[in-house]
Amino acid sequence: MAHKKGSGSTKNGRDSRSQRLGIKKYGGESVIIGNIIIRQRGSQFKPGVNVKLGKDDTLFALANGKVIFKKKKKKHTIVNVIENILQ
């Protein structure tokens, strides 16, 4: 008869990789064409000038410039990219 009880294995101890959502470029930051500005689920942030919405609701830049956030009503924020005139 065993003096100590054998330890059992556990089926826990795993976790899924986080989705890395959120704002990637903040207001006033420079972006180039194709830069991801926001990764999101749903559409809390809406695309504005020079910004397009990807199929997974990601917002990305269509032009080189600076990111501008503009509040619309209470829930939604419009994201614009203002092109750099002097380069």
UniProtKB/Swiss-Prot annotation:
Belongs to the bacterial ribosomal protein bL27 family. GO terms for biological process: translation. Residues 1-20 are annotated as: Disordered. HAMAP family: Ribosomal_bL27 (MF_00539). One of its GO terms (cellular component) is ribonucleoprotein complex. It is found in: Plastid, Chloroplast. Its main location: plastid. The keyword Manganese does not apply. PANTHER family: LARGE RIBOSOMAL SUBUNIT PROTEIN BL27M, RIBOSOMAL PROTEIN L27. Keywords: Chloroplast, Plastid, Ribonucleoprotein, Ribosomal protein. It comes from the Eukaryota. GO terms for molecular function: structural constituent of ribosome. Coiled coil: none annotated. NCBIfam families: L27. The gene is rpl27. It comes from Gracilaria tenuistipitata var. liui (Red alga). This is Large ribosomal subunit protein bL27c.
